[in-house]
């Protein structure tokens, strides 16, 4: 797995008070310095105050060693690991309708390294109009030196709309 390296782990910014005395993280031209690189130094996966940014979740997704593609009936599991099957994981499949959970299934699946398998889940037919989102997570069955039991190592999501859905319903 080469490529996609993290250049800046943390944003490079300083605390600064605005005209109302409210503190915020400032960088680039925020100090009236010219020339400036503007937000070039604000591209880390954690903010300058060390809180996690949304980019960290994207990095986790891109680096995960499984590809999970859920749908209304199950999930396709692609094991991108080189030597290990998926027997160390439990999978949690979740269906949401208009943002509300409506069905969950937990299961185990053994997919060998470099292989893919579709696993069906015993879910009801979803026919009511609405926006449906299908999510799946792979979590550790047992604690490891680097992760607690239940730690999510991979995730996937897909969705579809059934029938006409008004903007207020979604």
Residue ranges and their predicted role:
Residues 6, 133-134:
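Conserved long hydrophobic alpha-helices within structured protein cores
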Residues 144-158:
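Edge beta-strands of extracellular beta-sandwich domains
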Residues 90-129, 135-146:
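Intrinsically disordered, low-complexity Pro/Gly/Ser/Thr-rich segments with frequent PxxP/GP/PP motifs
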Residues 1-73, 81-87, 92-101:
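Extended substrate-binding grooves/exosites of carbohydrate-active enzymes
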Residues 74-79, 136:
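Short, well-ordered beta-strand segments enriched in hydrophobic/aromatic residues
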Residues 135, 140, 163-170:
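Beta-strand-rich N-terminal accessory domains
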Residues 79-81, 125:
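Non-cytosolic beta-sheet module surface loops
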Residues 112-119, 158-168:
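Short, surface-exposed linear segments at secondary-structure transitions and domain or protein termini
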